[in-house]
Curated annotation (Swiss-Prot):
PROSITE patterns named among the record's database cross-references: SSRP
An annotated GO cellular component: cytosol
Predominant subcellular localization, coarse grouping: cytoplasm
Function summary: Required for rescue of stalled ribosomes mediated by trans-translation. Binds to transfer-messenger RNA (tmRNA), required for stable association of tmRNA with ribosomes. tmRNA and SmpB together mimic tRNA shape, replacing the anticodon stem-loop with SmpB. tmRNA is encoded by the ssrA gene; the 2 termini fold to resemble tRNA(Ala) and it encodes a 'tag peptide', a short internal open reading frame. During trans-translation Ala-aminoacylated tmRNA acts like a tRNA, entering the A-site of stalled ribosomes, displacing the stalled mRNA.
A molecular function GO annotation: RNA binding
Pfam families: SmpB
Biological processes per GO annotation: trans-translation
Name this protein carries in UniProt: SsrA-binding protein
Family the UniProt entry places it in: Belongs to the SmpB family.
Source superkingdom: Bacteria
Residues in coiled coil: none
Amino acid sequence: MDIIIENRKVRFNYFIIQEFDAGIVLIGSEVKSLRQRKVSIAESYVTERNMELWLCNLHISEYTQANTKNHNPTRPRKLLLKKKQIYKISGNMKNDGFTVVPLFLYFNDKGIAKAKIVIVKGKKLHDKRETIKARDWNREKSRILRGG
């Protein structure tokens, strides 16, 4: 598994409820740009239309060697999942406080682009502070154990 890009803010801003692996419908120039890692996942999210899941605001830069028929960098991209998974995700999206965001994009062992999408619930400010305290304590603990 070759990770292309990870959205690190997801783990800090949200509680992760459940994870899913989804395929992404891409065109050729988008795959080439992904291989060059010219992608931004920070503002992206998942929406549901007609019982299909779409990845919105995923910015894949235009491929420089492509001809004039290049892709739109922020177009919505269809996610490929099993129907049972789509029903589960769309049901959770309708609940208050839950949202679906991509955690990271990767190429699997066969070289196919995939997205790890997660159902999340937003953290409050005090939860974020607890996360920072735990991270700082773990860092301090490892320094003490190393003898530094």
